[in-house]
């Protein structure tokens, strides 16, 4: 909590962190098309085309809006502007998050010393994050990561705001807007789902005292929630439509969820109504993915994978074109392969699962050396 004498100062400093980071990002922003996926995202935003799987449809809609703002002749410049703005907002939200964490730890801000510690620490922390290599890099080009970071930041801030007001009437509204934000974020990048454990732990420690039984139950519920969102909504609904259920059967299931939510609200089943309404909000946010299906049927100039049928759309969401590679064994140089994969055991008797396991864990220390020296130190320094 913040004493009323310092609320205005808190708002000024929050705005200051936003403007400082925004002006730096704007000044260093790519003035036109840059490398990697940026050109693709700019072109598909401007034309509402279909980019590479899994699509990022919400980014395309926002990019389309920014492409219509008459501030520069270069369309790429207009779409690029989305990243500095969302990145600066993420920095501002980080400032507000740090203030809430510090005040929760130290207590209410009542004098200048409290204000200096909370506000000063938040400014330093937010600006330190603002100028980290990864965030700054994402903030100056048309990519999904900048706005995905913003959505993660706003979800974290909202759950901390809920924690302050959890004993007040109507606190459920914060949970519902978090669910909606997470639904929208699925149309950007699935990174936002990683905030689920944090949200669950904040809710748990705000409402309960620590006990292993209740803590493990919370962890289990969090896992089930993640499974429902990722496997049953994001990936499951399109698969249902592609299966025997068809689009009509899938629509019936969605309508049933809405009807169940209405029933729970009318009959004042508070916990059930919040859970079902949260699911509805996620579904509404996730509905941005219908734009991929709709636009592909219009055959835009950029129509990657042509996901205009339900089956093709499922393949598009599943990223099937990329294939799959296991995490182990790690790819590194320095030793000779100790076996050659010759196919399934019944076709090649010289290969067995035991050999695969031995190869996977062969010289583990050298695998970790490669991971640390190349994939961490070289890529991030």
Which sequence ranges carry the predicted segments?
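Short hydrophobic/aromatic helix or loop-helix immediately within or flanking a transmembrane segment
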Residues: 45-74, 84-85, 92
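Membrane-interface transmembrane helices that cradle and orient dolichyl/undecaprenyl
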Residues: 107-116, 155-174, 201-212
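Transmembrane-helix motifs of polytopic, lipid-linked glycan transferases
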Residues: 15, 81-110, 153-158
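Membrane-interface alpha helices of multi-pass inner-membrane proteins
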Residues: 44-47, 125-127, 174-188
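Short acidic/glycine- and proline-prone juxtamembrane loop motifs at membrane-interface regions
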Residues: 134-145
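Start-transfer (signal-anchor) and selected internal transmembrane alpha helices
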Residues: 1-23, 108-123, 250-284
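Extracytoplasmic catalytic/substrate-binding loops of multi-pass membrane glycan-assembly enzymes
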Residues: 29-41, 51-62, 302-306
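Transmembrane signal-anchor helices characteristic of membrane glycosylation enzymes that use polyprenol
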Residues: 7-34, 129-131, 189, 280-299
